[in-house]
Structure formats: structure tokens, C-alpha cells
């Protein structure tokens, strides 16, 4: 059982309260939007002269880019469109340029605060990766056309988020420009009759009788004679789907009409019979069809003679004998002020007659056009990025799962293990070597205080599980650490799953085998040095709410990225610092863990909440014997024999000492007392 004495809960409670106050006092701040300038737009589209940018808010926020009146495409922000958030919890913003044909013209990373990208990967390497999306044709399926650039191996999470943001935003921008026919199926075909097309909702219908018109034009100079005959029997619909257009017009006429369409255009058929003519005759002189308009919300488009296609007859034998058959090319590029064909819109034919009083009476006749579901193209649901990464890393996931299973066996069966010193040592060193080589250098499974900061910032700026699921190895380890904190405290990670901690312990074990003399730090100094790591943790967290960039610089006090993630492939100051820390660990076991590690300090804060307290103590500990104190891996046992849960890394060394009859002085005395003395000769 734990030794009685002065409680060490106060520092943890104070730090926890301080962090809570920081979180409550800092409201979420809206992130500023990065906007392109003309020079950047010109570079992204490869224009040979000045371009004009036009900010647009609907239907997709972005900037239209044109040159000499010709639309080059649109630029969008991945942060504004897809809310791309990096592992730092802050925006990862890329400006993406997409042509009307659905091709990515270029991309430029304009804002990021990722630790690896900021201080681990060269700007040229990042720029080359982002530029690798140039030329990707979004109209082609996955696996077709130009291959996507591979994520950067040392920054899989950050570059994976960049890739996902570019592709998602580019698809949205392309669809808004009419890619894929504005969501219209332009490929599928099956024979259909006029009755079939009406039953499917391919045409909107409006019928105004002569009697209805007579009432609407009461008082006209030339009155309308009321009757049941049609004043206007109107049908209108999108005929781009071959099932509609080819059956309606015949293969030859449909091919000719569809082939004349420009990107961002669709064909609308206006079919009518009755007294009133939707086209009229004025358009031949004015060039505009003043009687006809297409409306969607506040948007109104009046076609002109350049949009008009004359059709003499329909190919459907069961269609009514229409008096007028007209086709109009309709702008369906919402970014260029067009109709969105995926939403209902109206064909409005306005009939007018002069009144005897001198004014003019108007009768608007509406036929609502809807694209039937049968003719809509549903975008294939993209596999979420995090699922893609999990599928790719199944072998690594299996390795981590196996390690966690073995660790669970060790911790749940620790009483049996600690009674076998040689077995414990082999298991301990073997597991640490696996943690370093396989989990650390092999799978890049090193946790960092940056991830804690990212989590806290995400709670304030909009938490998304997808961001943290992108890296399955890190997610699994953090899940295990969370459970470990609940059951046993920080030692699950610090003592067993931290690659850098494993490197320190293995290096110190080798140093001791080589006879390197160890430095015993006085207890008073030892405890005061703890202040450094707790101060660093609070400073990094607090600074991140002010400036993530500066917080990441301070977080370089962790040599994890240099040693584990980057494998010493960094600038010499980082390598020199890492080597200095490791050198200190040769003389003081786990020197960095004891005094400098901000992540360990952060994990120590909730250590008092653990459920299990399976580390045994005896009344003699600290009073009659201090062997466990001198052998403790991180100096977590004080002179009174108490184990400080904030510092303990759960290495089980003290339990091995306590249960070894050949090592523990208490057990030795008991053995001597129990030994038979024999009779004197």
C-alpha cells in the first residue's frame, strides 16, 4: 500500500485549474481568409498577361478569374470551402485554381502552422508537393488520368490533409462551373415515349385556357373570347439527358444541338400550342426573346437569338402537335450568373395586351422545370481521407494492436512478472527495443505535446474527429494512453510506449554496462527541477492560443521530432540539442523525462485520477530501506518511500526489487530470521 505522508495532489490540481481557466478565458477567434492577388492568379492559371479577379460569394465562395473578358476559371480557398484543419488544430489553407473544364490549373499553400512543415520539411519540398496537383482532371475517375502526388512520408498527416482539401475544394469549384453537366446525366440512354417522359417528370407543364386569359385581360382593347380552347398549353424541360433529348428530337438533331453546347450550358426545350406564341416575332428585330425568361430565386435570365435553336418537328409519334418547338441554350454555370439545374427553376412566358385605358395588362405563365432523379448524376461518395489512411496502414495497425495487447498482459499480470527478475528484465528491454525501432523509427508512432495543443485548440475552434483519425498509429496510441491514464496513470506511455523514452533507457543501460558512473541528484534539487517541465507545458499551451507558430517553436524543446520522426535529418542546432539531451541521459537515467519533458508533465496532471494502485510498498520502505529509491528509473520515490504518481513511469523495477529475496533487505532479514539456528555442539 502507499505510504502515508504529505499529499502531492496540490500541484496537479493547481495546473489543472490553470489550464481550465485558460480554456474558458479564450474564446474561439474567427480565422482570417487568405485572398489571391492578380499576380498569384496569373501564375496559377499560367496566363500570358494581366488577369481580373472578381470575388463571388454564391453558390460557392471563390474568386472568378478572367482575361480580356474570357473566363479562365475560379480560385477557391480550401479553408473557406472544406475547412481544412491541420494536426496543429489550425487552418491549412491552399488556394486552388480550377478551369471550367474541371482541370486543376494550379495550387499554392498560403497558410499553415504544422510543426513538421514549419520546422521539418523544406519550403521547396512542400511547394513541389502542392504543385504536383497541377493538371489533375477532376472529370476522370480515381485511378484514371494523371496520378496524384504521394504524401510526404515524414509528414503524412499534414500533407494528407492538404491533398484532401485540394481535391474536395476543387471538385466543389468544378461542379459549380458546370463540370459533369451541372449534375446532369449526359450519357445514359433508353427508349422512351412522350407519355414515359411526362410520367418521369422530364417536362414542366402550364395550361391557360381562353377563359382564363379573358379574365386576365378584361378591359383589353382587343378582348379575348372565352372558351375551353388553350390560350397557351406550355411544356418545358431540360433535354440534355439522352433519354429525353434523343427520344424527343431524334439522334441526328439531338447530336447536333448537344454538340453545339459550350462548357457550362444546357439545352431547354420550350414546346407550346394555343393562341399565344411564346417566341412572338419581335425577337427577329431586337435579338431578344422579351416574352420568355428563366427564373430561379432572384436570378432572371432572358435568352437572346444567340441562344435559340430552331426545331421543325419532334421524333416522338405520341407527342402532341405543338405549334412552336424551341430550344434554348441556358447558362448553368452558377459562378457566371447561371441557373443551377440541380434545383427547380421556372420558365416564365409573359403574355401582354394593351388596355383600353392606355396601360398594359400582363399575364405571367409559369412552367416549373425539375431535373428528375433518374437523369441526375450523383457524385460517387469519396472515401473519407482517414479511412483511406487506415486501409493503407493495416499492417502497422496490427503491429500496434499486438504491442498494446502484450502491454496489457504485462500490466495485468505484473505480480507474476515482478517475481521473476530475469524474465522482467528481458521483457522490459525487449519491449523498449520494439517501441524504439518498430513503433518509433518504423511506424513514426512518437506522441508529442503538439498533439495535446492541437486537441485543446480544436475544442475551441471546431472539433473534428476526422483530423485526429488521419494518422491511425498516433490515434491508437493516444487511445491506449487515455485508457492507461484512467487505469494506471502516465506510466503506460512514458514507461512503455514512448520511443524517445525507450531510447534514453536503453542508452543508459548500455552506459551502465560499460561502467559509466551515474550521478545521484540530491532529492531537494531533484524536486525543484520538476518545475521546468511543468512550466514548459503550461507555456506551450498558453502560447498556442496567442500564436501557434511561436508555440511550435517553443515545442522544439521536445527532441522527439529530430530523433524519432526525422531520424536526425535536421539542421545541426536541432541535432546538437538532441545529442546533448541523450548525453545527459547516459549519466542520469531518463534525464529528459525527469526534468524537461512537457508531454510527460501534461500527462502527469490527471495522474491522480487513476483507478488502480497496484504498486506495493512496505512499512519499512524509506525508514529501514531506501534501495528502491536509489534504483528508481526516474527518481519517483522520495526518501520516505512514497511513490509519486506524477513521476512514476510504471517500469516495475521497484516491485522487482521488493519481491527479490536476494536483493530486498527486508526479505533478506526475514529469511535470516526464519532460517533454523541448529543446536550448539
UniProtKB/Swiss-Prot annotation:
InterPro entries: 4Fe4S_Fe-S-bd, FMN-bd, NosR, NosR_regulator. To P.stutzeri NosR. It is a multi-pass membrane protein. Pfam families: Fer4_5. The keyword Transmembrane helix applies. It is found in: Cell membrane. It comes from Paracoccus denitrificans (strain Pd 1222). The keyword Acyltransferase does not apply. This is Protein NirI. One of its GO terms (cellular component) is plasma membrane. Residues 1-30 form the signal peptide.
Amino acid at each position: 500500500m502507499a505510504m502515508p505522508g504529505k499529499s502531492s495532489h496540490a500541484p496537479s490540481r493547481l495546473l489543472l485549474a490553470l489550464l481550465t481557466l485558460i480554456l474558458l478565458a479564450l474564446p474561439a477567434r474567427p480565422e482570417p481568409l487568405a485572398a489571391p492577388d492578380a499576380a498569384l492568379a496569373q501564375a496559377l492559371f499560367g496566363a500570358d498577361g494581366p488577369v481580373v479577379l472578381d470575388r463571388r460569394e454564391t453558390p460557392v465562395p471563390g474568386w472568378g478569374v478572367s482575361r480580356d473578358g474570357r473566363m479562365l476559371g475560379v480560385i477557391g480557398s480550401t479553408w473557406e470551402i472544406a475547412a481544412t484543419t491541420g494536426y496543429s488544430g489550425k487552418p491549412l489553407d491552399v488556394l486552388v485554381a480550377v478551369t471550367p473544364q474541371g482541370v486543376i490549373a494550379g495550387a499554392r499553400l498560403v497558410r499553415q502552422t504544422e510543426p513538421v512543415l514549419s520546422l521539418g520539411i523544406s519550403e521547396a519540398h512542400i511547394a513541389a508537393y502542392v504543385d504536383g496537383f497541377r493538371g489533375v482532371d477532376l472529370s476522370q475517375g480515381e485511378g484514371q488520368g494523371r496520378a496524384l502526388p504521394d504524401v510526404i512520408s515524414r509528414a503524412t498527416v499534414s500533407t494528407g490533409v492538404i491533398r484532401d482539401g485540394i481535391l474536395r475544394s476543387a471538385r466543389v469549384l468544378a461542379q459549380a462551373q458546370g463540370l459533369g453537366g451541372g449534375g446532369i446525366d449526359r450519357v445514359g440512354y433508353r427508349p422512351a415515349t412522350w407519355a414515359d417522359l411526362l410520367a418521369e417528370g422530364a417536362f414542366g407543364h402550364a395550361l391557360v385556357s381562353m377563359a382564363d386569359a379573358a379574365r386576365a385581360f378584361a378591359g383589353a382593347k382587343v378582348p379575348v373570347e372565352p372558351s375551353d380552347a388553350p390560350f397557351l398549353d406550355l411544356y418545358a424541360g431540360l433535354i440534355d439527358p439522352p433519354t429525353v433529348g434523343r427520344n424527343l428530337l431524334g439522334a441526328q438533331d439531338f447530336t447536333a444541338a448537344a454538340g453545339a453546347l459550350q462548357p457550362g450550358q444546357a439545352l431547354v426545350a420550350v414546346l407550346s400550342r394555343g393562341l399565344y406564341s411564346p417566341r412572338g416575332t419581335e425577337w427577329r428585330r431586337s435579338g431578344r426573346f422579351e416574352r420568355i425568361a428563366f427564373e430561379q430565386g432572384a436570378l432572371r435570365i432572358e435568352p437572346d437569338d444567340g441562344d435559340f435553336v430552331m426545331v421543325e418537328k419532334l421524333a416522338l409519334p405520341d407527342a402532341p402537335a405543338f405549334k412552336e418547338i424551341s430550344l434554348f441554350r441556358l447558362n448553368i454555370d452558377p459562378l457566371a450568373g447561371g441557373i443551377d439545374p440541380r434545383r427547380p427553376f421556372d420558365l416564365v412566358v409573359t403574355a401582354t395586351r394593351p388596355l383600353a385605358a392606355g396601360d398594359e395588362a400582363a399575364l405571367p405563365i409559369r412552367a416549373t422545370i425539375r431535373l428528375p432523379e433518374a437523369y441526375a448524376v450523383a457524385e460517387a461518395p469519396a472515401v473519407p481521407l482517414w479511412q483511406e489512411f487506415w486501409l493503407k496502414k493495416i499492417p502497422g495497425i496490427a503491429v500496434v494492436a499486438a504491442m498494446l495487447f502484450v502491454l496489457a498482459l504485462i500490466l495485468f499480470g505484473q505480480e507474476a512478472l515482478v517475481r521473476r527478475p530475469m524474465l522482467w528484465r528481458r521483457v522490459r528491454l525487449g519491449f523498449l527495443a520494439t517501441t524504439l525501432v518498430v513503433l518509433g523509427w518504423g511506424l513514426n508512432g512518437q506522441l508529442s505535446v503538439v498533439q495535446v495543443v492541437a486537441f485543446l485548440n480544436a475544442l475551441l475552434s471546431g472539433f473534428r474527429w476526422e483530423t485526429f483519425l488521419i494518422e491511425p498509429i498516433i490515434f491508437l496510441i493516444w487511445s491506449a494512453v487515455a485508457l492507461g491514464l484512467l487505469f494506471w496513470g502516465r506510466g503506460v506511455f512514458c514507461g512503455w510506449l514512448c520511443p524517445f523514452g525507450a531510447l534514453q533507457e536503453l542508452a543508459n543501460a548500455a552506459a551502465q554496462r560499460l561502467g559509466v558512473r551515474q550521478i545521484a541528484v540530491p532529492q531537494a534539487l531533484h524536486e525543484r527541477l520538476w518545475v521546468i517541465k511543468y512550466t514548459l507545458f503550461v507555456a506551450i499551451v498558453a502560447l498556442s492560443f496567442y500564436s501557434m507558430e511561436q508555440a511550435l517553436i517553443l515545442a522544439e524543446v521536445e527532441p522527439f521530432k529530430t530523433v524519432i520522426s526525422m531520424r536526425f535529418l535536421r539542421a545541426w542546432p536541432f541535432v546538437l540539442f538532441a545529442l546533448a539531451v541523450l548525453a545527459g541521459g547516459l549519466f542520469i537515467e531518463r534525464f529528459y523525462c525527469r526534468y524537461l519533458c512537457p508531454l510527460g508533465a501534461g500527462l502527469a496532471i490527471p495522474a491522480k485520477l487513476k483507478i488502480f494502485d497496484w504498486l506495493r510498498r512496505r512499512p519499512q520502505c524509506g525508514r529501514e530501506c531506501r534501495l528502491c529509491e536509489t534504483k528508481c528509473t526516474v527518481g519517483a520515490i522520495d526518501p520516505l518511500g512514497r511513490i509519486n504518481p506524477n513521476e512514476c513511469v510504471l517500469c516495475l523495477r521497484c516491485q522487482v526489487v521488493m519481491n527479490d529475496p536476494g536483493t530486498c533487505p527486508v526479505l533478506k532479514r526475514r529469511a535470516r530470521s526464519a532460517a533454523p539456528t541448529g543446536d550448539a555442539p
